């Protein structure tokens, strides 16, 4: 039987567990504002705004200047490296702006996906080199949690056993390194919604991927109470001809989680995966109304699904900043309700909130 060499002290474990629980306190979720410079280029070009460092700062300021209404629905904000060191118009660092609201600051630490040779276009994620040193610095600079994204895709031949195993192991290495530095790792194995597969196929693949991830986390002695999971919801592929209800998506999603995610994990913060703002809220709401026991907080870690209406309202104009911030607050509040199963739906069929945010082969 393997011996246990304690990786973390009782104090370290308590700190990690406390941070994780703060982020997913009832009715709270995560704003993912960690789009890379390249991803911001796509967002800004949609509204005809040049992708400069100053414009990226101004856009992040729209989100981060939200008033105290967001305290009750946002538990954490994921920053990109550049944003972590930017300030608002008054010279106040964004990190302090967020911390002063009692919101936990997080940082994206992976360095993007790279091809896995010998596979059918599958990938792994790079960024383990120097990660411990970067985590130590980020912790000093105010970050208490981190995010690392792995990507898997569903096709006839994928995900392969190799891709599942490699990505599970890289997530576990990342998680272990974060915890050694007092940072809560968000483990993100995203199964892309590309393809014409049905709900059952996505559920099956999600179960296989999550089972591998938690096996790897155990192998690497990761302290589960000090982690969060950021999975896809179980949904059909974007090209699937069958339309499923939020209730069907919720049942498939919660069933997959119940079969694979230990109850020691404090929270599951779903990615929105290109769903429209409204769809992402309705599905999260249905998940929290699902009639199965759910031992974890089930909440959101949304990027596009919290930002699309705000971006549309802003359009790079200073005069629109206030209105854009209001749009963000509205989505944050809606998702805070959905995370408690208390959202009744907007009744809006049109408008920005109903626009699909799907991008094929999405890479940040």
Curated annotation (Swiss-Prot):
Q: Which residues carry this modification: Phosphotyrosine?
A: 5
Reactions it catalyzes: beta-D-fructose 1,6-bisphosphate = D-glyceraldehyde 3-phosphate + dihydroxyacetone phosphate
Keywords, A to Z? Answer: Acetylation, Glycolysis, Lyase, Phosphoprotein, Schiff base
Sites bearing N6-acetyllysine, chain numbering: 111
A GO molecular function assigned to this protein is: fructose-bisphosphate aldolase activity
Enumerate the active-site residues.
188, 230
Q: Which residues cross the membrane?
A: none
Which named protein is this?
Fructose-bisphosphate aldolase C
SUPFAM superfamilies linked: Aldolase
Q: In which pathway does it act?
A: Carbohydrate degradation; glycolysis; D-glyceraldehyde 3-phosphate and glycerone phosphate from D-glucose: step 4/4
Q: Name one GO biological process term.
A: fructose 1,6-bisphosphate metabolic process
Family stated for the protein in its record:
Belongs to the class I fructose-bisphosphate aldolase family.
At which residues is there a site annotated Necessary for preference for fructose 1,6-bisphosphate over fructose 1-phosphate?
A: 364
Residues bearing the modification Phosphoserine: 36, 39, 45, 132
Q: Which Pfam families match?
A: Glycolytic
| Enzyme nomenclature, EC number | 4.1.2.13
Q: Which residues bind substrate?
A: 56, 147
According to the record's subunit comment, the protein's assembly and interactions are: Homotetramer. Interacts with ATP6V1E1.
Q: Which gene encodes it?
A: ALDOC
Q: What else is known?
A: In vertebrates, three forms of this ubiquitous glycolytic enzyme are found, aldolase A in muscle, aldolase B in liver and aldolase C in brain.
